[in-house]
Amino acid sequence: MLPSENGDEDQGSQKPKRAYLRKGEGTARFRMTRRSAPLTSSPAINLPRFTPTNSAPSSARTIDSGIPHDDDTRPPTTASLPLDQPSVLESHDSGNRSESNERREEDNVEVVSAMQSYVPGDRSSSVLETCSKVSEEATQLRAEADRITAQANFINSMKSVSITPSSYSSNISGPIYQSTPKGSLRHDDLSDDPTFLPPPLVPPRNHSPQTLSSLASSGSLDTPQARPLAGNRLNMMVQNEAQTGISLLNNPRRQPMLPAHHHPSQKENVPERKAPSEHVYDEPLQIQRPHRRNREEQRQKHNLMLQLRDTIAHLDYASECVWSTRKKQEEAYAKRMKELEEDFESKMQMIQEDNTSEEERLKRERRDIERDRKILQKGIGEREKEHTQMIAKLREKLSNSESQNAKLRQDKRAVEEKMKKFIEENEKLTKDLNRNRATCQRLEKHIKQLRTEKEKDDREKEMFAKVAMNRKAAASGIATGSAASSRLPSVSSLASSMKTGSTGKGRTVSFADDEPEEQTLEAGEETMQPEFIMRPYETKQSRFGTSTMYRDSIGETTRVTSTIANGLLFEYSNGDFRWMNRQNSVEIYRIAVDKSIIVNLLQYNISFIYFFQRQLEVWRPGNNTTLISVKRREVRTELHCENGTYYTEMFDRNGRYVTKDFCRPEVFKDIPPGSACSYRDGGTRYVEYTAPEDFELVEPEYRLRWYQGKVMVCKIIKRPRCNEKTLRVQVDVTTGSGILEEVESQLKDGQSQKTTVFPWS
């Protein structure tokens, strides 16, 4: 029958014992017997993966350290020690030791720390060699192993088996030589393997071997250890549980039960039994009702085996680190030796080369000395003869050198002449290239101009065709719906022309401020994307007024300036600008790419569009249009629409004009200077003619003066009963620069007072 885990039946009969592991020590701090020899100076190494918070290793030697398992000097592992097999021969009297013996044993115990003091950076594994030196501790362990082997032989004769569930299942694999609790053990198996460590069943002190033999033979050992296993599965379970005690760390701790009575000398140890411990103390099966002393010893043995296993793993890890460091040092040594050998070989090669050159020099000097010695041995006549021959050779050598120098000078002059020709040809080609580039640019401009003129001619032909079709429709009595149309081109077509002309802008700009509502030619159908919304980030005072800089999320900027004449000036980052008054009646837009200027009178549906150095277009309601050309033969073309019929007046630079329609023949007339012509709307709109290139368009909303193809001046008259100012727009036809001015209604000294709103160039 298995004993109770809480040990309730022994609370009143056993005295409390001091906990073997003190509070806070854990598996990293353990006790070991004092030795007379001094402790080793090598640092202890802590292996974090063996702590309870980490995953448990599969064996005490999880590192391939290279130390064979048959090494006698190695301490036994957990699997080879008696972990879960309690003694079947311990009697009740073994727990009645005196308190003085317990104190003597505790005094012979010291606390050893296995915390980490040095962990190398490189954790590479290496093969470790076996240790050839047998220490004193290894000798003691070997003697202990012999003693345990003798005890195991006695136990095997009893044919008993342990089914103690003192440890829980674990995934730790045992070493090569491990105890096998499956079935009964034979004496010859133990004698063949000297490293086999069966359970340490030590007979109690108050029983002799004869007494134990009599107990075993009399059959009084009626305990679970004396009965065989029920089946193979239980046998395998016991074998797995007996391999290691690391499963003690994976199970929750049972609350210790304090005995009812305590010994007076151990009252100070009672709080220590309340302290939590990371070990689960097993209660193995006993032959009869065991004393608490036996269970304490079993627990101490179990904890010592766990500490021994961790210490072996730490030693293996330290040995592996040492050997990895040795391997690194050997590699560094080999590398350094190789470098030194290469350096030595290079230096030896340099020395050999120096020796060779020195030997050659000595040979030359030796030859010269030998020649001089022979000359000195000869007579005066022979010396003079040799000197004469030497002089002749030197002269011949000199003449050859001079001829070679002359040839080289000649070649040099030829090369210089050739290089000079190349330089001249290169300069000529460079000039031709520059001239051709200029010609190409001029031709490109000419082609562009021709293309523009062709587009204008096509547009005029289309206009004339439209007039002809309308005239035919009127002659045939078919009603037309042109009276309901506003003007040509419409606002949408003008907006499209503005968008195509502004290649640099290419998008609509809005502002986050509460600016006055504006009706631009770009209709509001386009949906603004969030990155195109501009927000103010800088405000300062400029020469035209207070200006605010706006910026969107993609880096585009726009400067908005509040000007006089109750207007706003928008300057875009691509060079375009737009001015409009707060009444949304006048709008001026300039495109920086082609220097085009657009003036819109939004309340009257009138537009002025000036294309730089090409023409000026005036669009009125009812499809009445005026085209003023800068370089064409016809300086002005008037398109009239009356009662759905169209006719055209074309004025040339000689002072003559011709009227064209599809009902009457063409009429050529001369215009007297100072007269009026081109009447519209019952005479309210007309043109005052001064010269072929000097005329003024007089209309109720504005006055437009064209002066000799150099200056265009447009005076925009303010609306009655509105808080507006009369504006004057002047544009230089040749340069594209201009100015916007505010005109006062009152005259001073017969002259109108003008104030500059803003200029542009």
Swiss-Prot record:
Residues 164-173, 479-497 have a biased composition (Low complexity). Residues 1-11 have a biased composition (Acidic residues). It is found in: Cytoplasm, Cytoskeleton, Microtubule organizing center, Centrosome. Keywords: Cell cycle, Coiled coil, Cytoplasm, Cytoskeleton, Developmental protein. Residues 129-156, 326-464 form a coiled coil. The keyword Hydrolase does not apply. Residues 1-109, 164-228, 252-280, 479-510 are annotated as: Disordered. One of its GO terms (cellular component) is centrosome. Residues 51-62, 210-223 have a biased composition (Polar residues). Residues 90-106, 265-280 have a biased composition (Basic and acidic residues). Required for centrosome duplication. Plays a central role in determining centrosome size. This is Spindle assembly abnormal protein 4.
